[in-house]
Design a protein with these regions (language model features):
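Hydrophobic alpha-helical segments within soluble ligand-binding/sensing domains
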Residues: 92-128, 181, 220-240
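An alpha-beta-alpha
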Residues: 111-152, 243-255
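Flexible loop/turn connectors
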Residues: 167-172, 179-255
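Alpha-helical recognition/docking segments in bacterial nutrient-uptake
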Residues: 1-112, 172-173, 179
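Short, well-ordered beta-strand segments
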Residues: 10-13, 128, 202
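Short beta-strand elements in bilobed, periplasmic/extracellular small-molecule ligand-binding domains
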Residues: 32-44, 126-130, 142-167, 171-172
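Short, solvent-exposed amphipathic alpha-helices that sit
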Residues: 19-34, 109-116, 136-154, 183, ...
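Short, conserved loop/helix-junction motifs that constitute active-site signature segments
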Residues: 78-83, 121, 191-196
């Protein structure tokens, strides 16, 4: 009984599995003592599942670390959790002043990252953002992409049909999904084009394999390990945190 009473139960509710979410998770649990028990669940962007998980978890955990279902709208079911016990991760373009959060900015920070790459991008006259209809990424990123292209004089296109993608010379492709990065590289090879010379490729969210794929894929990303570390600090120290992590550019040979 004594040992059980010392266990701190934590719910870590993420949206879906990706290699960078795994980096977040590994960093999170690495910074917690052995008597902290973490239940890792995924809501898969299913609102009904998200609501069910939250409702059924109320009162069972000491801390709730949650990726909200939507970037634009706070999920009302989270009102069932006391604000001091809840930490919001990643999505956060909504009113959240009474809550702790560690989020990323999909708008202005995305725009500023493109500005940092402006001179590299100028080797290519056109930018194409790969944004399929079912992509669970904030729609507002499209507006900031278009704004950057218009202000900097790039031809721009937002391509929804990734299945029938044709890689063209003189184009930089911005890929959000890991599968789309692979698709662009493979399709470029089929067309006889070299990444980083004939066309460019920029990935959203860095993963270790981007260091070695096709001599290196340039990425823009928050530090997911830092997010995990800071989430662990929230759990351990009971200190409120409200911050947006910086979006960093990792320049490699694909641009």
């Amino acid at each position: 009984y004594y040992v059980t009473s010392q266990v701190t139960n934590v719910l870590l509710l993420l949206d879906q599995y990706t290699p960078f979410k795994e980096a977040l998770y590994n960093s999170f649990v690495k910074h917690l003592p052995i008597n902290y028990k973490v239940d890792l669940l995924f809501h898969q962007y299913n609102e009904r599942l998200f609501n069910t998980i939250i409702r059924e978890s109320v009162g069972k955990y000491n801390k709730y670390i949650v990726m909200n279902f939507d970037n634009e709208k706070f999920s009302m079911v989270l009102n069932k959790i006391h604000p001091t016990k809840l930490l919001l991760l990643d999505f956060g373009k909504f009113e959240k002043e009474k809550y702790s959060y560690i989020c990323q900015d999909f708008d202005e920070a995305f725009y500023q990252a493109l500005l940092m790459l402006k001179e590299k991008l100028r080797h290519y006259p056109q930018l194409v953002l790969l944004f399929s209809k079912n992509l669970k990424h904030p729609q507002s990123s499209k507006e900031y992409f278009t704004r950057f292209c218009e202000e900097q004089g790039f031809l721009c296109e937002i391509q929804e049909d990734i299945e029938n993608l044709t890689v063209r010379k003189g184009v930089v492709y911005i890929a959000i999904k890991q599968q789309d990065v692979v698709k662009v590289v493979k399709q470029g090879r089929l067309e006889g084009l070299k990444c980083g010379r004939d066309f460019g490729l920029l990935a959203y969210n860095d993963i270790p394999s981007y260091e070695v794929i096709d001599e290196g894929i340039t990425s823009l990303s928050i530090d997911w390990e830092m997010m995990g570390n800071e989430a662990a600090n929230f759990v351990l120290n009971n200190v409120p945190v409200q911050k947006f992590l910086p979006t960093e550019v990792r320049l490699r040979k694909s641009l």
